Design a protein with these regions (language model features):
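Cysteine-centered motifs
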Residues: 3-5, 20
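Bacterial N-terminal signal peptides that target proteins for export
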Residues: 10-29
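Glycan-processing catalytic domains of CAZymes
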Residues: 42-361, 367-396
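Bacterial N-terminal signal peptides
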Residues: 26-38
Length: 398
């Protein structure tokens, strides 16, 4: 919903997320801005902030560390002390309404929780259920939980998290926000992450936010979930960055990482992984206008020098490229069009793509101190394993 201060300013009230989205479109707000504005209150998530969250934060004493790292969302309890601490640190909370969707769903407890905490400015969204597709909780039971939350008077949106992007055809349009988690490192190809974000986006209404949940843990700590898998490890800094930009390339409107506890609170800690994640989140914050940019269709043509490696393990293009339009730029990214290209593989590639129009000047590569090699129509560049390049702003056409 629109946050209270904006709703009062406009003299508007909305009880449905879709109504909020339609209103926001009329006002010229992006889906990401709506996700920020409509969920946690103006103070907690101002319009400019792109949603970046993290799971399993433990006590509220850790929230300052999390806020300092650039996160503005966490999962946590619907408890006054925790919500107050989150608000003080400028963080929104994805919280359970007191009972998860399923056979044991406690509607009375949910109504009481919503009545007590829904208006708290730090309450970002009500977490209906985690991975109903994996746990075989039917879409009908999830819908029932969503309806109970809404009938209880919730103004904050509902959320659910899927395990498989293909299941979004059944679950993707139940909650106000659809999330999907894929943790492929190292037992699946990294391309599996990108593939399932894409499936979720395609099966979910275009005006419904999709949030990607990214692996930031070592499966060694959860080896019982992957019996027989060997050589488990956490993601590298390059894999973390590639998955983060893959989420943007495949249409996600926000990102979460799993989890703070795995890196910082358990007996075996991962300080290098935490530092790598902080660098990625800092980069997202510096490039917020890119992450909030509009995806634009273009008559794309591309080519791989080595045809034998042009497909990744998901049988999609090894390098995923999209055209983005930044409407409201900043000092780093002026308004204009940019091409984001993400190598989803552990292999190097020489990759060529045709520009949307014949360029009348050089094509800068964002924050790399160089210009792309181009003849005005095509760009050719070298991609290291899991590399990310951003080209733009694209010069005007001739």
């Amino acid at each position: 919903m629109l946050c209270g201060c904006l709703a009062r300013r406009l003299g508007l009230e909305s009880r449905a997320m879709n109504g909020c989205l339609r209103l926001g479109q009329a006002l010229g707000l992006s889906a990401v801005a709506l996700l920020a504005l409509g969920s946690a209150g103006c103070r907690v998530l101002p319009e400019a902030d792109y949603p970046v969250g993290i799971y399993s934060v433990g006590s509220e004493t850790n929230l300052a560390d999390i806020a300092d790292a650039g996160f503005n969302l966490v999962t946590g309890p619907a408890r006054r002390g925790f919500l107050d601490a989150a608000e003080a640190n400028g963080i929104g909370v994805l919280a359970s309404p007191g009972s998860h969707a399923g056979e044991g769903f406690d509607a009375a407890k949910v109504r009481a929780t919503v009545a007590t905490h829904d208006r708290h400015p730090a309450l970002w969204s009500w977490y209906l259920i985690d991975e109903p597709d994996m746990h075989r909780v039917s879409p009908e039971l999830v819908t029932e939980a969503h309806q109970v939350v809404k009938r209880a008077g919730a103004r904050k949106p509902t959320s659910l998290v899927l395990f498989r992007g293909d299941e979004a055809q059944w679950y993707g349009n139940i909650a106000d926000i659809t999330m999907v988690d894929r943790y492929p490192v190292p037992w699946l190809p990294l391309a599996n992450f990108s593939q399932h974000i894409h499936k979720t986006r395609l099966a979910t209404d275009a005006n419904r936010p999709v949030v990607a949940v990214i692996q930031s843990f070592d499966w060694t700590a959860h080896q019982g979930v992957l019996p027989g898998e060997e050589n488990l490890r956490p993601p590298t800094k390059h894999e973390l960055r590639s998955m983060t930009y893959s989420a943007l390339a495949r249409g996600a409107n926000g990102i979460f990482y799993y989890s703070y506890a795995d890196m910082r609170l358990k007996e075996r800690k991962y300080p290098e992984l935490w530092e790598a994640l902080k660098r990625v989140v800092k980069e997202v914050r510096q490039r917020e206008v890119l992450f909030a940019a509009e995806h634009v269709w273009w008559p794309k043509a591309h080519h791989f020098e080595n045809q034998d490696t042009r497909f990744n393990a998901a049988l999609e293009a090894s390098v995923q490229s999209v055209l983005l339009r930044v409407k409201r730029g900043d000092g780093l990214l002026p308004p204009g069009h940019y091409i984001l290209a993400v190598n989803t593989t552990p292999l190097p590639h020489t990759y060529r793509f045709r520009l949307p129009w014949r360029a009348g000047g050089q094509v800068p590569v964002l924050e790399e101190g160089r210009h792309a090699t181009t003849d005005g129509s095509w760009v050719v560049d070298r991609f290291d394993p899991f590399a990310v390049h951003v080209y733009g702003p694209l010069p005007a056409g001739k």
